[in-house]
């Protein structure tokens, strides 16, 4: 059995660790509400953009934007993978990466090649170690991400799709369901899935200048950027929720370990006292 001093040292070490996990839990709890607010605030913009594109697509029946045209054969697939910059978020990132590798292998088994751009330090570090062709990366996105920091990697995929180098693009991220549940999601980004036809609730039509096709050309890129940005906000909220839950579990485990070590310490102390008493009694009897 370890000595009382060694056990006390272990207890002190676990208590210090518990202070860190509790602090991280409280920080994540305070950040998650702000992240949820940003996520909810951005949703109406993406929904409005989707409606506008639906109107524009119907107004320009003689023109189909390249982002709306399905390719007959998929020879190369692109993925935009979003992760966190920091760890200590349970299995949030690893679960996403494992599913991403499975999806990439499935396409490779079909004979398609895979290209990847990553958003977030964890994804960048992980996929540089595996046999996946990374064509772009951005890190240090922070808790309040800016759209400007994403435009570069988004453009890499948009240009590749426009030039015919990539036939399909997926957006991979952790969708925020609630504080306890975050779901790894694979959304098809390009070509855009067919939008539902807009039902007219009025007797007038829209007038586009110079024409619907030109407006659609400008709006489409903004819409793609808004989808990636929305996914990033979902992932940030998921990160804080996962970290809060993971740190709470770590704090609870620390409490259990401290209780166990305290019990061991009490038994060791009791055994030492019993030994001392036995020695005193034995010495007195000898006299």
Curated annotation (Swiss-Prot):
One of its GO terms (biological process) is proton motive force-driven plasma membrane ATP synthesis. It is a peripheral membrane protein. Pfam families: ATP-synt (PF00231). One of its GO terms (cellular component) is proton-transporting ATP synthase complex. CDD domains: F1-ATPase_gamma. Its main location: membrane. It is found in: Cell inner membrane. Keywords: ATP synthesis, Cell inner membrane, Cell membrane, CF(1), Hydrogen ion transport, Ion transport, Membrane, Transport. GO terms for molecular function: ATP binding; proton-transporting ATP synthase activity, rotational mechanism. The keyword Cell membrane applies. InterPro entries: ATP_synth_F1_ATPase_gsu, ATP_synth_F1_gsu, ATP_synth_F1_gsu_CS. Produces ATP from ADP in the presence of a proton gradient across the membrane. The gamma chain is believed to be important in regulating ATPase activity and the flow of protons through the CF(0) complex. F-type ATPases have 2 components, CF(1) - the catalytic core - and CF(0) - the membrane proton channel. CF(1) has five subunits: alpha(3), beta(3), gamma(1), delta(1), epsilon(1). CF(0) has three main subunits: a, b and c. Belongs to the ATPase gamma chain family. This is ATP synthase gamma chain. It comes from Stenotrophomonas maltophilia (strain K279a).
């Amino acid at each position: 059995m370890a000595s009382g001093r060694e056990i006390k040292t272990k207890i002190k070490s676990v208590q210090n660790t518990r202070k860190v996990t509790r602090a991280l839990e409280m920080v994540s709890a305070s950040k998650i509400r702000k992240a949820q607010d940003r996520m909810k605030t951005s949703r109406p913009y993406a929904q409005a953009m989707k409606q506008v594109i639906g109107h524009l697509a119907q107004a320009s029946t003689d023109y189909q934007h390249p982002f709306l045209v399905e390719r007959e054969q998929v020879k190369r697939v692109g993925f935009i993978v979003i992760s966190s910059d920091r760890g200590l978020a349970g299995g949030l990132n690893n679960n996403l990466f494992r599913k991403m590798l499975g999806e990439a292998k499935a396409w490779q088994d079909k004979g398609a090649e895979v290209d990847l751009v990553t958003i977030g330090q964890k994804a960048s570090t992980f996929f540089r170690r595996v046999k996946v062709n990374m064509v772009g990366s951005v890190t240090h996105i922070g808790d309040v991400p800016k759209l400007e920091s994403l435009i570069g990697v988004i453009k890499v995929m948009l240009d590749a799709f426009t030039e015919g180098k990539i036939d399909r693009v997926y957006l991979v991220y952790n969708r925020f369901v609630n504080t306890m549940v975050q779901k790894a999601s694979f959304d098809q980004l390009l070509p855009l899935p067919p939008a539902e036809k807009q039902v007219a609730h009025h007797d007038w039509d829209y007038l586009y200048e110079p024409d619907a096709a030109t407006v659609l050309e400008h709006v489409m890129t903004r819409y793609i950027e808004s989808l990636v940005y929305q996914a990033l906000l979902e992932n940030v909220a998921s990160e804080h929720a996962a970290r809060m839950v993971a740190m709470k579990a770590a704090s609870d485990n620390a409490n259990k370990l401290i209780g166990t070590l305290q019990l061991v310490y009490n038994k060791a102390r009791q055994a030492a006292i019993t030994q001392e008493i036995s020695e005193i009694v034995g010495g007195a009897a000898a006299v």
